[in-house]
Amino acid sequence: MENLPFPLKLLSASSLNAPSSTPWVLDIFLTLVFALGFFFLLLPYLSYFHCDDPPSPSPGKRKCPVGRRRRPRGRMKNHSLRAGRECPRGLEETSDLLSQLQSLLGPHLDKGDFGQLSGPDPPGEVGERAPDGASQSSHEPMEDAAPILSPLASPDPQAKHPQDLASTPSPGPMTTSVSSLSASQPPEPSLPLEHPSPEPPALFPHPPHTPDPLACSPPPPKGFTAPPLRDSTLITPSHCDSVALPLGTVPQSLSPHEDLVASVPAISGLGGSNSHVSASSRWQETARTSCAFNSSVQQDPLSRHPPETCQMEAGSLFLLSSDGQNVVGIQVTETAKVNIWEEKENVGSFTNQMTPEKHLNSLGNLAKSLDAEQDTTNPKPFWNMGENSKQLPGPQKCSDPRLLQESFWKNYSQLFWGLPSLHSESLVANAWVTDRSYTLQSPPFLFNEMSNVCPIQRETTMSPLLFQAQPLSHRQPFISSTPQFLPTPMAQAEAQAHLQSSFPVLSPAFPSLIKNTGVACPASQNKVQALSLPETQHPEWPLLRKQLEGRLALPSRVQKSQDVFSVSTPNLPQESLTSILPENFPVSPELRRQLEQHIKKWIIQHWGNLGRIQESLDLMQLRDESPGTSQAKGKPSPWQSSTSTGESSKEAQKVKFQLERDLCPHLGQILGETPQNLSRDMKSFPRKVLGVTSEESERNLRKPLRSDSGSDLLRCTERTHIENILKAHMGRNLGQTNEGLIPVRVRRSWLAVNQALPVSNTHVKTSNLAAPKSGKACVNTAQVLSFLEPCTQQGLGAHIVRFWAKHRWGLPLRVLKPIQCFKLEKVSSLSLTQLAGPSSATCESGAGSEVEVDMFLRKPPMASLRKQVLTKASDHMPESLLASSPAWKQFQRAPRGIPSWNDHGPLKPPPAGQEGRWPSKPLTYSLTGSTQQSRSLGAQSSKAGETREAVPQCRVPLETCMLANLQATSEDVHGFEAPGTSKSSLHPRVSVSQDPRKLCLMEEVVSEFEPGMATKSETQPQVCAAVVLLPDGQASVVPHASENLVSQVPQGHLQSMPTGNMRASQELHDLMAARRSKLVQEEPRNPNCQGSCKSQRPMFPPIHKSEKSRKPNLEKHEERLEGLRTPQLTPVRKTEDTHQDEGVQLLPSKKQPPSVSHFGENIKQFFQWIFSKKKSKPAPVTAESQKTVKNRSCVYSSSAEAQGLMTAVGQMLDKKMSLCHAHHASKVNQHKQKFQAPVCGFPCNHRHLFYSEHGRILSYAASSQQATLKSQGCPNRDRQIRNQQPLKSVRCNNEQWGLRHPQILHPKKAVSPVSPPQHWPKTSGASSHHHHCPRHCLLWEGI
């Protein structure tokens, strides 16, 4: 390249050293300086011209000015006009000068001064050949040319000697930064980057630009180096970081017109237009943009443009002689070949610039330099061009570019999708292409699956894909924005080793490498000298390696077992490792050593996988061949793994490295088979006693692994590990198992670890374990779960028996409990007709029925537990604490019919003599011991037991507390009893606990259907206890307890209530009425009682708040009496009707139908509203107006405002209670006269108690009349108006009676620790006019 052909030397010497060149160059410089100075003088005045001015011959007036200044005023106007006239004249003179210069240059060039590479060009042609995107209008303003011409004025020493500048080319090497415009440029002649003429670059330095090499053809390589001329130097201002090119830099094939345009672009522009001056500035901007993408567009190779074409086009230069044209053609051809390789070298340098660590140097010397005589079968890479850049490469045998391009994009897309560990294999599998694999298509890699198709054909001679020069030139434009992502050989080897260790299925891409050990190490592991980017370019690679080295893809138990495998490495033949890597494999010794280490590591890992597969195979063989070898009766069977023979080893060899074919069938057999016999499968499963010492386990782990017994040790370690996991798991879950959890979870975890039995069959197996008898269940548990410890087996067997018993007895008990409840109701209703019978008969019949029920339901003996409850109750333990205690919970759970169990015996019902029940003596306890009282108790106990459905929590504490406190309060009760009434006063209280078997049974039924009621009743335990515990001063708890309970009683139960229940409830009603009156009278003067009410507010917040918010002032009682008299008639009737239910359901029952949950809440709200209304009631009537009260019942039932008030209360209450009272209307009328005798024995006014009894009877009559009017729908308003005056008089009399008996307001204060609930209405002590309470008033007795 440094030696020029002889004819070219002579031509350049004769033309450039002519003495006549110096004067005209000086003339050009002077002319340009003059024109530039004149332009600067006119430039301020040119900015005032507008674009809409009429066109003038001067080209400077057609361009809109860049900026606009203020129009001068005064003197500046005339000056501007004068300058405007002179400007076109000056421009014309400048154009004439330029045309003269051009005319002078034309003949001078024709003489041969610049005949070698340049020549004149007419101004018109220059304007025509200017590119569309790079030129402006021919009338460009002169200001655009100013920054281009300014460097000419600098006192450059070489600028002063243009002859030397034009005649001495630099002999130095070419230092170029290759750049090109985008391929989308139109194929028009453009300004070249590397000018052939030495002079124009000095005058008008243009940015580097690659011209269009072939007319109407794709762009060629960026440029080539022509023979440098002698003693030529060039100083070119640098634009866009481009290095100055020598004067000999010539495009590889320039058309004649392009050459001429490139020679004098600016001078010719000055002659006709300023287009090229402006074009040069635009080329500078375009060149700056193209420098940023200097490698984004690659040129077509030389093969697309044969040398003949280039030579013909180069020879078409009309300025050269025939000899010169031939020389130029030859030089262009040779230089184009060299530039092709230099271009590819520059591509490598660009990649070098993109990678800080110089990835080409990190890979070492990838290939040798090019050799012109190299063999075609052994192509050499093109990277290291610096050593022998003069040598040209020979033709290479490359793969099909289309195939390589498609495979590259497939692999390139896989780099960012799927598993990262598969990238190296997918890339390298296509990176080694053989000579005869051009038409072979590489299938896409399947992630999460293993492809059985060989991607390439393995041949003895492999040529790296990346060593091919031709495909790179085709692929580079597509990947210029994204650098290639190819792993280094070491990284690929690691990724491949971990990939194979993570996935037991191997691709049979290289079956020839599978030898004795069966290790398939494809050639992709031995990738060498491949173009890749370091980890700094791709920060995800270090993380990838860490993840792969951390064995994230391996299961946890496989990772744990790898430590065992690393202890005892298999004795692998050394020739197997050497056979993996060929001797002539082009890798360094260090890289070979690292690859061998990774291969060994892979073999060790996969050896463990093979052992596990062989273990599963041996397990299936043991199931089929030796089903009866294990011992039964709870003893662990011996370890069966030692029975493996040489035949199984041969099977292991067959399966060893064919996992892609064997894994799926074996997994299907292991996970898909359903064993026919559970005991047979479990016997055949290898097991071991969990009491193995750590020394024995360690000794087994450190046993040397032999080639023939390697699978035995693997099975031993694996099974030991499984047993340890199971032992720890059972230890953690043993407490949960004892608490009642299903053991299926334990079985499922065991089966999941073993992977020997399907999880879906665990339920069937558990049902087999749960035998009908505990003895068989224990045996089966020991046989199946013999690997567990004896204590664990025993606990598991007991739990299975309990679980089986619970499920066996659950459904029958739920069905039988309601049936027994109905039977007991019938028996109790029959006992109501036998009031004259002895009390012992009732007790005996109750005891007999209880024994019968217990025998039927198999109730476990709970006598000791009930004694414990009685003991706690005798100590006055609060019922809320008792209900929350474990003993109380167990007592509630006990009568549910779960049969007693025994870990070593069958289930047996408890004997009749041991049935836990309440003693008959406390049940029939009476203070007086009279026969009538016992009969009353027997009658009331059945009905009270029947009504236990309402509140579930008052079952045992109510009974126990009553029994514990009867004796303590008997003397106090006698002190308050009136003569003749002491016997009947305590009848309802003692009758509460008369029939405990029915109460317990009803509680069980309630607990089955309404578990939510327990929460509501837990907040009211003391109220329930107060019903039966407090016989005197604190007896006021009874009405409120009944009120709370009545609000939860289902109305459907009231409809089906027999007549005997009503009788019993009416007797209870008498006692409640008397105690309500006493409570109200004593409450205003009892501050302690009021304090206790305040202290108990948290227990009853809703009712108390409702009463407190609606409590009227005592001063407004009379006004409310007149305003609420008529509307209150219906509430009285309704509350009286409700009191009928209250008498029936005085005590809480433990059973409610499912409809109670929503209906009970409505009832409760209704009574809250009633309580607020009760406070505003006037004084009650006295007993002297009994006849008036009887007549008043008709008035109440015929009230017209009753229906309106019922609408306010709620539609639910209207429907339920109307139906209930309509059903019992006739029965109440029949028994109305039987209960007029006084039953309350209190030292208060006897007339008041007698009046209360008649009030109760009045409530029944009112309910019956209400039902009748409800059905008829025609209220009698006239009767109501006619009877309003008697009602008023009765109330006034009752107020006077309340004032005559203030002594009743003083109760005993320390009778019971239970204080009245907070929701009792309080009457102000300051008011002495109204000391009554609506609770003992006739109008509110039904509450």
UniProtKB/Swiss-Prot annotation:
Q: Which parts of the sequence are annotated with region: Disordered?
A: 55-88, 106-235, 624-654, 895-951, 1080-1156, 1309-1331
Q: Which GO terms describe its cellular component?
A: membrane
Compartments it resides in:
Membrane
Q: Where is the composition biased (Polar residues)?
A: 165-178, 627-647, 923-944
Q: Where is the composition biased (Pro residues)?
A: 198-222
**What GO terms in the biological process aspect are recorded for it?**
cell differentiation; spermatogenesis
Topological category with respect to the lipid bilayer: Single-pass membrane protein
Q: Where are the transmembrane segments?
A: 23-43
Under InterPro entries, the record lists:
SPATA31, SPATA31F3-like
Return the Basic residues bias intervals: 60-82
The primary site where this protein sits is membrane
Report the domain of life of the source organism. Eukaryota
The biased composition feature labelled Basic and acidic residues covers 1104-1123, 1133-1142
Instruction: Cite the entry's keywords alphabetically.
Output: Differentiation, Membrane, Spermatogenesis, Transmembrane, Transmembrane helix
Q: According to its UniProt entry, what is the function of this protein?
A: May play a role in spermatogenesis.
- Enumerate the PANTHER family for this protein: ACROSOME-SPECIFIC PROTEIN, SPERMATOGENESIS-ASSOCIATED PROTEIN 31A1-RELATED
Family per UniProt?
Belongs to the SPATA31 family.
The identity of this protein, by name, is Spermatogenesis-associated protein 31A6
> Which species is this UniProt entry from?
Homo sapiens
Q: What is the lineage of its organism?
A: Eukaryota, Metazoa, Chordata, Craniata, Vertebrata
Provide the gene name from the record: SPATA31A6
